[in-house]
Amino acid sequence: MPLPWCFPFKQGKSKIAKTCSLPLDEETGLKLLYEGPTPKIDIIAVHGLNGHRENSWTAANGVNWLHDLLPGDMPNIRVLSWGYSLTTAANSHETLSQQKVSEQLVCDLWEMRSSTNTINRPIVFIAHSLGGPMVKSALLYADSAQGTPTVDLRSIRLSTRGAIFMGTPELDSRLIGLQSYLATAQGSEQESSDIYKEAHWLVTTLQSYPSISQQFWTLFVHERPDSLSASSALDQTASSSTQENSSHIFIQADHGGMIKFESSLDESYLKIKEHLVHVGKMLK
């Protein structure tokens, strides 16, 4: 029988309903993929734009490595995948604020961990593509949250021990054009457009994140399809290479395929697993 907290929470009953007020549907929110006998770590997966909390991590042969592979190598973990959408179910043309969506992640995590008495359990995030800025924005929000006797959202940031960012946008040469656009559009009518607001949120999040990133271990995973040159691949590490307590690896796959592994023998999966096991040992 499914546990009630595996599904989107009913806002009317939530202790933090006023903070977490985004519309939810059956495909968004947290979903439990695995829970070991004595979990020591919460692994939280966050997909990219227009992704799915299960399908995005599932290979063509039906293997979802978060559910089917990782528990075999790390049995004492709890794995949850978080789904989100930037449009509402009622109106596909209504765009939700990326900031508000990232705040929802914090609220969902706190609600689930509170209801299962696991508020202080260590967290490791695994984020793909836009999921990276979502997680970074969520952690910045949690870090600045003011706690109350019943709700302490800051515990989400304080419990975070690691993050794996897979194919996520960083402040490197690929975002120079976006930064130029913001500088040009500032003070004009474009400043009120959704495009400007989204770009401003992304750049601001990436610029602010280093202020908290040194508090935990980070692995940056970069895609390297056959068509990508070595120089282009190295450029992907430029912005984050100086971050303390971080490592970089490359995966021979395209953007969508880099988070799908068909078996426990997959070379890319072995790289990810090695780093997760390392974090697990550090937390013992």
Which sequence ranges carry the predicted segments?
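PEST-like, low-complexity acidic/proline-rich intrinsically disordered segments
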Residues: M1-K13
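Short, surface-exposed "cap/lid" segments of acyl-processing enzymes
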Residues: L24-N76
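C-terminal catalytic-base region of ester-bond hydrolases, centering on the histidine
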Residues: I43, N50-G51, R78, A90, ...
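Serine-dependent carboxylesterase/thioesterase catalytic core
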Residues: H47, A89, Q99-I212
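Eukaryotic short linear interaction motifs
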Residues: N50-N55, T87-N91, L130-V135, A163, ...
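Short coil/turn segments at secondary-structure boundaries
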Residues: N55-N61, S92-L96, S137-Y141, L175-Y181, ...
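Conserved alpha/beta-hydrolase
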Residues: G72-T88
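Active-site loop/turn elements of alpha/beta-hydrolase fold enzymes
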Residues: W82-L86, T168, E223
